[in-house]
Amino acid sequence: MTDVASSTPGWITRLMARLGTTGWIGLASFTAFTGWMLIALLVRSTSSERYIFLTDVHWLLSRFGLAVAAVMLAVAVYIGLIRHGDVTAWFRRITYTIFAFMLLQGVVGGVMYLMGGRAGEDVHIIYGYGVVLSLPFFIFVEVTAKKRPAMGSYIWGFTMLAAIIVRCITTGPPA
């Protein structure tokens, strides 16, 4: 009888080991949220109902993103400035999950734009790009940093993310 570990392809085993528990939790939560959103969109019968649903999701993700950015900034300050520690694997995996949700936020905004919706101010779209692109830049800086600890990259990254999200919220359509 063959055991599961020997019959599993090598790339899956390496992926499972690399993701770790926090990576799987992040991947599962992102997949569940995206699945819920797609099912909810399919249930809606008219495009106006779909647009209203997307507007609600976009609004909720922006507020959730701001809260998560503030919490991650506090954690980054604690790890980097108070404990003088370096980036941990779980912190990086959570950051990847946050990036995935910010990317989803951008996709939702783009779909709303294609459906005819417009932001309160035109710069909202530029700030939306800033939200999506800010974390990958600071992740790149941290991953390629030769000097350790490199937690300062995430302190700057989550500060910028929170600030850009605040600006996005203020330039979006009126509530």
What residues fall within each predicted segment?
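Juxtamembrane boundary at the C-terminal end of a transmembrane helix
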Residues: 44, 163-175
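Membrane-interface helix-boundary motifs at transmembrane edges
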Residues: 82-92, 143-150
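Membrane-helix exit/interface motif
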Residues: 75-82, 106-118, 137-141
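Hydrophobic alpha-helical membrane segments
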Residues: 101-104, 124-138
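Aromatic-anchored segments of alpha-helical transmembrane domains
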Residues: 33-37, 102-107, 158-168
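Hydrophobic transmembrane alpha-helical segments in integral membrane proteins
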Residues: 20-30, 40, 49-70, 172-175
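Structural signature of hydrophobic alpha-helical transmembrane segments
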Residues: 62-67, 120-132
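Membrane-helix boundary connector in multi-pass membrane proteins
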Residues: 114-122, 136-154, 170
